[in-house]
Regions:
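Conserved P-loop NTPase nucleotide-binding/switch module
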Residues: 340-383, 387-388, 400-428
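Phosphate-binding/switch loop-helix module in NTP-utilizing enzymes
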Residues: 320-354
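Carboxylate/His-rich catalytic cores and anion/metal-binding grooves
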Residues: 191-195, 201, 257, 264-295, ...
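Flexible beta-alpha connector loops of hexameric P-loop NTPases
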Residues: 143, 298, 308-329, 361-376
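N-terminal pre-Walker A segment at the start of P-loop NTPase domains
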Residues: 206-241, 276, 284-289, 293-300, ...
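Conserved NTP phosphate-binding and transfer environment spanning the P-loop NTPase/kinase superfamily
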Residues: 388-391, 397-576
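N-terminal accessory targeting/assembly segments
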Residues: 1-185, 190-194, 205
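Glycine-rich phosphate-binding P-loop
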Residues: 240-272
């Protein structure tokens, strides 16, 4: 390790040289109160910015030990510090001048939810913050004077105001930690009370717009029906009341634009802790809850969908269904079975985004097309089996078919954004609208021993003078490229995650791409099953955190996904 003054001397020595001379700065430097690491230096002022990190020992940072004693509070503290750092950095980004990305100081921008990120990580010894800096240049000539401003004027201020307890509001930070502990208490309370979700009285469920996750202003606050209201005594906040959704089959109905999908959206994101002031802080859902929908054109590999689809006219095997281009019903059947394999205890569905022929067949259709001629067993006929025999609850938004009233344990009507428990009313009316015999074929648990087939790496090479392709002795290194939140490419394959709706952030997608790359290179051997591979990955994550994905150094830009999203990613990876 070198001193900060040695870094200053290095900056002076490379000033006005060609841009690649910046590479000599790579290393670690002791500053007052923290260690600065230059982990990766960009090759060009127009290229992706350089990777920087700072490390502060707990002795220097001064945070109470109870604020990093377990993973929950450590992740919460790290999220809070990242937000503070981003506020400070925004005052200085591009204050240093130059061409291209010169002067950029970039920190992860956190949303309304709390995620474990590499942007800030806290161990028992220290706090590490990671970010990006665009090293300044005039054209492609080094402007080290401007970089000196960043390292010796701007960053010390940002670090001092963001990562030292003495400069932060102790009361505000305490509230942040207490909120996380209260949220975790509710999550555990759901299990104890056989609930799958909780929505507090006073919650603000609508969002500002379709492209914003911030709460809407001047909207109707949530108020639970008396029959579903539960009370909890939280460790810090004290008594809280709200709607408890019991395990089983819950139907959410109501007129168009009355708030059905808004409630479902809040529940699907209730798997994450939300920040104070979000309006959904105390909207908590079973951590394994999975939103499912139809996905026309989806890739499916060796999935046992016989629980829902059987006796195809072409005699195609549905016990090991594979297709490059699934229909809506096939994709939704596969999604449910894959969700079961991933350990989901709650399925969230919206009639609007489901395949109609997969969800329900009305009485008239059953009379015209007999069961013997219909290979699809609709979800209507399987939902009770899923709960009674597999312990999987369903929360379903419906607006057109009344058939679901017959199987629902709880019916919630959204009326002008206010929930009303109409279970008794709906059940009383069911007698007047009987269903035809809807007994499904006997339930059997889907097989879940799918072997992940090994994908041969692409051979690198080039054409010779005569146009003949000459392969390299070693195959090309597998490369990944992120396409925002909605997917990535790995090698020559695209992994489409557009309809994995509980993914929040491109940093989670970045992690998924790295996990899949690691698995393809080191775990997928044609012998291991998908659950075995995912378990091996999570054992590594538990022991080493996201650091094991690093290739030489850990960078900013990774966030932890759930197992459900890891399964969803691997299942969408096209392979032989």
């Amino acid at each position: 390790m070198q001193s900060s003054e040695q870094l200053r001397e290095l900056l002076h020595s490379v000033n006005r040289k060609s841009y690649p001379a910046y590479k000599s700065l790579k290393g670690t430097y002791q500053f007052k109160g923290y260690i600065l690491s230059i982990d990766h230096v960009q090759g060009d002022p127009f290229a992706s910015p350089s990777h920087i990190s700072v490390r502060i020992s707990h002795k220097q940072a001064g945070f109470p030990e109870e604020y990093y004693r377990n993973k929950l509070v450590a992740v919460t503290l790290a999220d809070y510090l990242t937000r503070q750092f981003e506020k400070q950095v925004n005052h200085f980004t591009f204050r240093a001048k130059g061409s291209g990305k010169s002067g950029l100081i970039s920190v992860t921008k956190c949303g309304q939810e709390v995620l474990e990120r590499t942007a800030c990580q806290i161990t028992g010894q220290e706090i590490t913050a990671r970010f990006f800096v665009g090293f300044p240049a005039n054209g492609r000539t080094i402007n080290a004077t401007e970089l000196e401003k960043i390292f010796f004027e701007f960053l010390p201020v940002c670090v001092e105001k963001s990562f030292f307890y003495r400069n932060l509001s102790g009361k505000e930070l305490e509230k942040v930690i207490f909120l996380a502990e209260d949220q975790e208490f509710i999550r555990e309370e759901l299990k104890r009370r056989s609930l799958v979700a909780f929505v507090n009285d006073g919650a603000i469920l609508p969002r500002e717009s379709g492209i914003s996750s911030r709460p809407m202003r001047d909207c109707v606050a949530f108020s639970s029906p008396d029959s579903l209201r539960v009370s909890m005594e939280l460790p810090h906040k004290g008594k809280i009341t709200g709607m408890g959704i019991p395990a089983g089959i819950t139907l959410i109905v109501g007129g168009g634009y009355h708030g059905k999908s808004t409630l479902l959206n809040a529940l699907e994101l209730g798997i994450y802790n939300h920040i104070a002031g979000d309006g959904r802080e105390y909207v908590i859902t079973d951590i394994t809850a999975q939103k499912l929908r139809s996905e026309d054109g989806r890739f499916i590999k060796d999935v046992d969908i016989s629980l829902f689809i059987n006796d195809l006219p072409n005699k195609k095997d549905t016990y090991r269904c594979s297709t490059e281009d699934a229909s809506g019903s096939t994709s939704q059947a596969a999604g449910i079975v894959e969700g079961m394999e991933a350990g989901s205890r709650v399925f969230l569905l919206d009639e609007d985004t489901s395949a109609t022929n997969f969800m329900v067949r009305d009485s008239f259709m059953q009379q015209v097309i007999s069961r013997e001629k219909e290979p699809i067993t609709p979800f209507l006929e399987r939902a009770e089996d899923l709960f009674e025999k597999a312990g999987i609850s369903t929360i379903l938004v419906a607006g057109s078919s009344g058939a679901f009233f017959h199987i629902a344990d709880t019916v919630i009507q959204m009326d002008n954004y206010v929930p009303v428990d109409i279970t008794r009313k709906a059940k009383a009316l069911c007698a007047s609208y009987p269903l035809n015999d809807r007994k499904a074929p006997e339930y059997h648990a889907p097989a879940s021993h799918r072997i992940m087939t090994k994908v041969a790496p692409a051979a690198g090479g080039k054409k010779d003078y005569y146009g003949h392709f000459k392969a390299q002795e070693k195959p090309e290194r597998l490369k990944t490229k992120i396409h925002g939140k909605d997917g990535f490419s790995i090698g020559k394959q695209e992994v489409d995650l557009r309809y994995v709706e509980q993914l929040l952030d491109g940093e989670q997608t970045q992690t998924l791409s790295a996990l899949l790359k690691y698995a393809v290179e080191k775990l997928i051997d044609g012998k291991r099953t998908l659950p075995e591979i995912v378990e091996l990955l999570y054992e590594k994550l538990k022991k080493e955190g996201l650091a094991f994905l690093a290739e030489g150094y850990i960078s900013c830009g990774y966030a932890m996904p759930r197992k459900q999203e890891v399964y969803a990613c691997f299942n969408r990876y096209r392979r032989p």
